[in-house]
Structures are given as structure tokens and as C-alpha cells.
């Protein structure tokens, strides 16, 4: 019985030791657009834990955030992104046209899909004096819309197209 426990203990320690020898430290850079900062902080932490449990590798994901267009330009100009999560397919296409990613990136998933979600926030004055509650509220008399520069912000491009 003691021999059996000794053998099992030796095998277990060998497995743990071997796994730690082969485990890698992996650093990745996710270049993304501004509103995703908090999302990716949480997602990256969860993914790192998952990956370490699955493989034993320790993953550190660094983040770079800015306007989608500016981030695309940074990648085109040489920032070494491992992951690119931008607001518009247009920005990803610009990176692909410069040879930084596969030009056929859109065909990677079924139906040329790029699964993603985004949250829209209405920022109003204290007390919401104009009672902005939904999209229809935005066409009320006296309501003004402020949006970022569509030349550098993917969200602003969507705003421009929706107007």
C-alpha cells in the first residue's frame, strides 16, 4: 500500500514539475477602440485564467485604446498588435490593404461575420431637463447631438451614417 502511494505521489509531482517546465509566459497586445477598455480588462483577466488552467501557460494581455481610425493607423505604422478589435470593418480593411493582416480576414468566420456588440450611451445634463429617454428623443426640438470626429472615431462614423 505504501509503495502504491509513493508511486502515485512521484507521478503527481513529476506531472506538476513537468507542466511548470513547459509552461510559457505569453504577452499579447490588444489594440482596440476607446469604449472597450473596461470590457477587455475583465475579459482579458477571465481569458488568462482560462488559458492557464487549460495549458499551464501564463498569459498577460496588454491593451492600447484610442479612436478606431487612429488605432488602425498605429497598426499600419508598425505597432505590434497581436489582436485588433476595432469599431469598423473599414479600419480592419485598411490594415489588411497594407499587408499587416490577411486580406481575406472577413472570410474567416461563416457568413463573413465579425461577431461583436457595442453599447450606446446617451449623456445628458444633470436632471435630464430635456427628458432624453430613447432614440426618438434625439429629434425633439432643441436637442443637440455632440459626436466625436468621424475621421478618427468608428462610433462617430456610425453616428454620421445614421443621421
Language-model features: locations:
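Alpha-helical hydrophobic membrane-insertion segments
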Residues: 6, 14-15
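N-terminal signal peptide c-region/cleavage motif recognized by signal peptidases
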Residues: 18-20
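Extracytoplasmic/periplasmic substrate-binding proteins
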Residues: 157-163
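Short, linear, compositionally biased motifs with a strong N-terminal bias
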Residues: 11-12, 90
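N-terminal segment of the mature folded domain
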Residues: 24-153
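Intrinsically disordered, low-complexity, compositionally biased regions/tails
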Residues: 9-10, 60
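Bacterial N-terminal signal peptides that target proteins for export
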Residues: 1-9
Amino acid at each position: 500500500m505504501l509503495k502504491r502511494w509513493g508511486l502515485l505521489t512521484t507521478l503527481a509531482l513529476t506531472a506538476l514539475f513537468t507542466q511548470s517546465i513547459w509552461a510559457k509566459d505569453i504577452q499579447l497586445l490588444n489594440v482596440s477602440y476607446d469604449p472597450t477598455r473596461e470590457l477587455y480588462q475583465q475579459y482579458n483577466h477571465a481569458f488568462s485564467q482560462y488559458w492557464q488552467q487549460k495549458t499551464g501557460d501564463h498569459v498577460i494581455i496588454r491593451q492600447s485604446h484610442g479612436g478606431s481610425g487612429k488605432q488602425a493607423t498605429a497598426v499600419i505604422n508598425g505597432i505590434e498588435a497581436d489582436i485588433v478589435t476595432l469599431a469598423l470593418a473599414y479600419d480592419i480593411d485598411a490594415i489588411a490593404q497594407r499587408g499587416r493582416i490577411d486580406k481575406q480576414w472577413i472570410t474567416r468566420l461563416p457568413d463573413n461575420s465579425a461577431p461583436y456588440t457595442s453599447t450606446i450611451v446617451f449623456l445628458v445634463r444633470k436632471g435630464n431637463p430635456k427628458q432624453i429617454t430613447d432614440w426618438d428623443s434625439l429629434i425633439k426640438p432643441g436637442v443637440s447631438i455632440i459626436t466625436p470626429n468621424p475621421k478618427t472615431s468608428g462610433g462617430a462614423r456610425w453616428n454620421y451614417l445614421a443621421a
